């Protein structure tokens, strides 16, 4: 599959296999973007206004500010390839929105991105986990540890809400009537 992408016979690889192994094989066989050291796992993340690109979701547990800046470039490039009429807004996932919050790497990255003028994206600063789905930011950048925790938390929350909705709609006669009345909205 990686060879097909290399030979331009395919555009993407989808795998249910080991993510780490896929990244290693891809990095060894495919050309990286110039001056970018590390690949990142990314995903389209639904939000109130459409979709956001979120990266890194687990490939790089520890990152330098250079890596996070590279992820900003990669995420903005991916977003622009999907939505060519929009200039993406990029933010760093952090524990607060204030400039002084976060570890040294995230604060250093903030300073660099805040001073850098990019033609490819607008830097919006920090985004907190409770605003990931607001839709005000198109590209959300984090290290792989933080991104993976956010992803797993969102997945678990979605599963919990789905389970509770199913129980409430099938648990008694009123729930069943309510679900029938709301079937077109669900």
Predicted regions and their residues:
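Glycine-rich phosphate/diphosphate-binding loop of Rossmann-like nucleotide-binding domains
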Residues: 61-129, 138
């Amino acid at each position: 599959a990686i060879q097909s992408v290399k030979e331009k016979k395919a555009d993407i690889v989808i795998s249910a296999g080991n993510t780490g192994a896929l990244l290693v094989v891809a990095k060894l066989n495919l050309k990286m973007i110039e001056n970018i050291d590390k690949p990142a796992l990314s995903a389209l993340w639904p939000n109130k206004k459409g979709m956001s690109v979120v990266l890194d979701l687990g490939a790089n547990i520890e990152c330098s500010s250079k890596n996070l800046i590279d992820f900003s470039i990669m995420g903005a490039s991916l977003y622009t390839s999907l939505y060519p009429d929009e200039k993406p807004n990029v933010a760093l996932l952090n524990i607060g929105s204030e400039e002084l919050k976060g570890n040294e790497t995230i604060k250093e990255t903030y300073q660099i991105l805040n001073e850098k003028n990019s033609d490819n994206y607008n830097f919006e600063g920090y985004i907190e986990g409770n605003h990931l789905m607001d839709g005000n930011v198109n590209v959300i950048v984090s290290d792989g540890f933080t991104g993976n925790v956010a992803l797993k938390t969102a997945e678990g929350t979605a599963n919990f809400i789905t389970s509770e909705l199913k129980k409430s709609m099938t648990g008694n006669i009123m729930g069943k009537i309510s679900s029938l009345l709301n079937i077109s909205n669900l």
